[in-house]
Structures are given as C-alpha cells and as structure tokens.
C-alpha cells in the first residue's frame, strides 16, 4: 500500500507567507483525517523552528500549531518537517511531547551526516523517523544512495527524495528512485514541485520505480508553482492501480471542503516559477528574488542565473541580496565605462 503524506499545512504555508491560523489548521487536519490521509504534516514552511524575520514569521508558534492539529486527528498520523540548524533538538522534544508521530529530518542532499542525532532522538522516543534529501536534483544517483544509506544507518525508516526546485524530469526521477530502491532496505519516497508542470508525472514515475511514499498538497497548495496536487495524484494512482487508504471521491470532498475555510488558489506556473525550476533554485526563493530584483533595479532572470551559479540551497536568502547588489554595481560600472561589461574587464 502506498503511503500519502499531505504537506498542505506545511509546504502550503510557503504560499501564504506562513500565515495559516489555528482555525484553518484544525479544520483542514480534521477534514484530511476524515478523507483517510496517512500523514498530515504541519508547521512553518521551513519546518520546526523556522519562524524568523529571515524566513517569515508565523502568527502562532510551533506548539499551538501542533497541539491544534493533534486534537483534530484521530486515525491520520501527525508529521513535522525538521531541518537541522533551523530547528534544534529541543524543537523535536516539544513535538514529541505534543504527540507528533512522524519526524521528517531533512538535510541538503549531500549533508545527511547532520541528521544522525535527530533521527536517533526520534527513534529513541519510539516514533517514526524519515530522512529527507532536499534539492535532490543537485546530486547524481550514486551520491544520493550513499547519503540515503547514512540515514538508514542512523535509524531512518524511509528516505524521501525532495525535488525542492521542481527541476527534475521523469527520466531523472526514475534513475534516482530506482537506485535508492535497489540499494536500501527501507522505503523510498518522493516529493515533487510543479515548476515544469511535471509534479504528478514525476510522482507516478517514482511509484513505478518502486517508491512507497508520495507527498502531495490539496489543490497543489505549496511553494513556488505548487506541489503535487493531491486530487489529481490520487485520480492518476487509481487509474494505475495503486492501493492507498483514501479514494478519489474522498479527496475531492476534502478539496471542495477547503473552500469554506482555506480556499487555496490553484497555483499557476508563472514565468518566475519556470525560471527557478529551470535553474534549480528552491521554489520558496521566488518572492525574495523578485523583491531583490525590484529593489536593486536589476534583471530578475539574470539574478536567477547568478544564483544558480552559486548553487544555493534552502536557508541562504542573504545571498540573494548579495548577488542583486553585485549585479547593480556591475550595471553602474558598465554605464560608467561606456557599456563594457564588468566581467569583460576582469577576463
């Protein structure tokens, strides 16, 4: 049976600058539970401890968000996203105290070693620990397998490949998921973003390649161009004969019900989202890039290219300002030198 992890109340928070209310969290968690969703993930878009001036502040803290969801769930498991460095061991302790069932410990795709203590902390408490490799497009299959094996050794009960930038195509997804499925003794999952319009297709390919866990959000509510749309994914999974705890009818009832308390607008694939997917940048960076381009008066798409050259990962918003400022200085020098580009002068 395929496990569906619903990130609406976590990744969806990115789409509204992390402003979900307690009432919205309670209503959606209750509805998702009634729809038969396996895991309901809750929190700031960047996970436990993510609320900050840099990443965006939530109107309510982690404790209230998790307590609210916990009270609403009966059969669905409560999950959280945790990035070492943004969150601390104390944040996991709080989550476990409240009754979180699944802790998804997420690292950059080449930094799995920093997940060890947090996976072990979760397992010691008798809860489920998943490892998550973010920005998975930035590493080849063998590297991802080596990193996933570390998480498996630390005690992770599954490893999820996260296509954080929406960069991947079906062939890339198949190669990476197959490599992990063949090389691990634990389940493999996949988390897609829709920057290139491939979220559902990539999720189906991941399942064909042996993945047993897929992430999705109601109406695609999520960072950038959105996540895999839950309703569309479940419909396609039914067509392909995949067995789950839910049905298309139940998730459609869930989606329609959100119009009274959440009403997430179905994300459109804007040019900026396509650019972030094409250049392999974290989907949540788009509003920050647009703001910096406007403030410094630089070309937005040139800024995407520069940031791609820096190989940004999540949590490096300060580099967006740094590169926008550098582009602005180069533009000013170019004007002062009669149109000669700074990079030409330094070549």
From Swiss-Prot:
PANTHER family: 2-ISOPROPYLMALATE SYNTHASE 1, CHLOROPLASTIC-RELATED (PTHR10277:SF9), HOMOCITRATE SYNTHASE-RELATED (PTHR10277)
Residues at the site labelled Transition state stabilizer: 10
Top-level EC class as recorded in UniProt: lyase
Family to which the UniProt record says this protein belongs: Belongs to the 4-hydroxy-2-oxovalerate aldolase family.
Residue ranges constituting the Pyruvate carboxyltransferase domain according to the UniProt record: 2-252
Originating species: Burkholderia pseudomallei (strain 668)
Annotated protein name in UniProt: 4-hydroxy-2-oxovalerate aldolase
EC code: 4.1.3.39
Example GO biological process: catabolic process
Annotated active site: 14 (proton acceptor)
Catalyzed reaction equations: (S)-4-hydroxy-2-oxopentanoate = acetaldehyde + pyruvate
Pfam families attached to this UniProt entry: DmpG_comm (PF07836), HMGL-like (PF00682)
The keyword RNA-binding is assigned to this record: no
Domain of life: Bacteria
Binding sites annotated in the UniProt record for substrate: 10-11, 164, 191
Gene Ontology MF annotations: 2-isopropylmalate synthase activity; 4-hydroxy-2-oxovalerate aldolase activity; manganese ion binding
Binding site for Mn(2+): 11, 191, 193
Record's keyword annotation contains Metal-binding: yes
Sorted UniProt keywords: Aromatic hydrocarbons catabolism, Lyase, Manganese, Metal-binding
């Amino acid at each position: 049976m395929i496990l569906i992890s619903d990130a609406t109340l976590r990744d969806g928070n990115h789409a509204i600058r992390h402003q979900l209310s307690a009432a919205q969290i309670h209503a959606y968690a209750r509805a998702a539970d009634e729809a038969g969703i396996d895991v309901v993930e809750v929190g700031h878009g960047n996970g436990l401890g993510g609320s900050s001036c840099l990443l965006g502040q939530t109107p309510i803290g982690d404790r209230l968000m998790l307590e609210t969801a916990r009270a609403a769930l009966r059969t669905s498991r409560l999950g959280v996203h945790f990035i070492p460095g943004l969150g601390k061991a104390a944040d996991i302790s709080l989550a476990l105290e409240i009754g979180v069932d699944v802790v998804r410990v997420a690292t950059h795709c080449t930094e799995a070693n920093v997940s060890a203590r947090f996976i072990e902390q979760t397992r010691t408490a008798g809860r489920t620990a998943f490892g998550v490799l973010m920005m998975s497009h930035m590493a080849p299959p063998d590297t991802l397998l080596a990193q996933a094996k570390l998480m498996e050794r630390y005690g992770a009960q599954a490893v999820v490949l996260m296509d954080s930038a929406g960069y991947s195509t079906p062939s890339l997804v198949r190669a990476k998921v197959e490599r992990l499925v063949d090389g691990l003794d634990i389940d493999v999952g996949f988390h897609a973003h829709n920057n290139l319009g491939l979220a559902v297709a990539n999720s189906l390919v991941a399942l064909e390649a042996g993945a047993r866990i897929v992430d999705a959000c109601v109406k695609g509510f999520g960072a950038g161009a959105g996540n895999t749309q839950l309703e569309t994914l479940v419909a396609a999974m039914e067509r392909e004969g995949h067995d789950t705890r839910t049905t298309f009818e139940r998730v459609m009832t869930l989606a329609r019900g959100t119009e009274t308390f959440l009403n997430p607008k179905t994300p459109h694939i804007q040019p900026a989202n396509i650019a972030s997917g094409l250049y392999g940048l974290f989907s949540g960076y788009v509003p920050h890039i647009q703001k910096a381009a406007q403030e410094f008066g630089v070309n937005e798409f040139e800024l995407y290219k520069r940031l791609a050259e820096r190989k940004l990962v999540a949590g490096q918003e300060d580099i967006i300002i740094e590169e926008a400022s550098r582009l602005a200085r180069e533009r000013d020098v170019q004007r002062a030198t009669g149109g000669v580009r700074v990079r030409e002068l330094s070549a």
